[in-house]
Curated annotation (Swiss-Prot):
InterPro entries: Pept_tRNA_hydro, Pept_tRNA_hydro_CS, Pept_tRNA_hydro_sf. The gene is pth. The lineage of its organism: Bacteria, Pseudomonadati, Chlamydiota, Chlamydiia, Chlamydiales. This is Peptidyl-tRNA hydrolase. It comes from Chlamydia abortus (strain DSM 27085 / S26/3) (Chlamydophila abortus). The record marks 10 as: Discriminates between blocked and unblocked aminoacyl-tRNA. GO terms for cellular component: cytoplasm.
Length: 183
């Protein structure tokens, strides 16, 4: 059985350390657990893809090259190409509705206003996939627009704290892989 792990983020160097790209950063660390596995461009699937074969089946990791708001286009293309069941999809994304550092794993969840999640749900015609949501919090100052906040760089303090988020996310990812997660 093939599983799909989707990182939500924006392509391009200027976005690497932005809050909206925490999904890309997390998936990069997850893929590092598999020696010799690297992302490769797959233009026809609108993604960078890394594939892992294990005793539990195949796992396809993607970083869509469509920008956050159009993530569903890439997810639908990869899902169709590899014939992946919707309930075998895990989407890793930032979450402004959770305090910085909170990590949640849920199935069949709403989008919480996240346009990338909304795009995926619309493209799949279902929300019966898993979400690993990484809390990035909200702006501390009232005069900061939410879009500027999510596209803003992590502070030095957040860059240090994000390492703990990745450790917790990795543990929840392992539970999801083994089927021992709770929704």
């Amino acid at each position: 059985m093939t599983s799909l792990v989707v990182a939500i983020g924006n392509p391009g160097r200027q976005y690497v350390w932005t809050r909206h790209n925490v999904g890309f950063l997390c998936v990069d660390r997850l893929v590092q657990q598999f020696p010799g596995v690297h992302f490769k461009e797959a233009p026809k699937l609108f993604s960078d893809i890394a594939k892992v074969e294990s005793s539990q089946g195949s796992m396809v990791f993607i970083k869509p090259r469509t920008y956050v708001n159009l993530s569903g286009k890439a997810v639908l293309a990869v899902k169709g190409y590899y014939n992946i069941a919707t309930d075998r999809i895990l989407v890793i994304a930032d979450d402004v509705n959770q305090p910085f550092g909170n990590v949640r794993l849920r199935q069949s969840a709403g989008g919480g206003g996240h346009k990338g999640i909304k795009s995926i749900t619309q493209s799949l015609g279902s929300n019966d996939y898993w979400q690993l949501r990484l809390g990035i919090g909200r702006p501390q100052r009232e005069n900061v627009e939410l879009s500027d906040f999510v596209l803003g760089q992590f502070t030095e303090e957040e860059q240090i704290g994000i390492q703990s988020v990745f450790i917790e996310a990795s543990a929840l990812f392992s539970q999801w892989c083994s089927g021992t997660q709770t929704a």
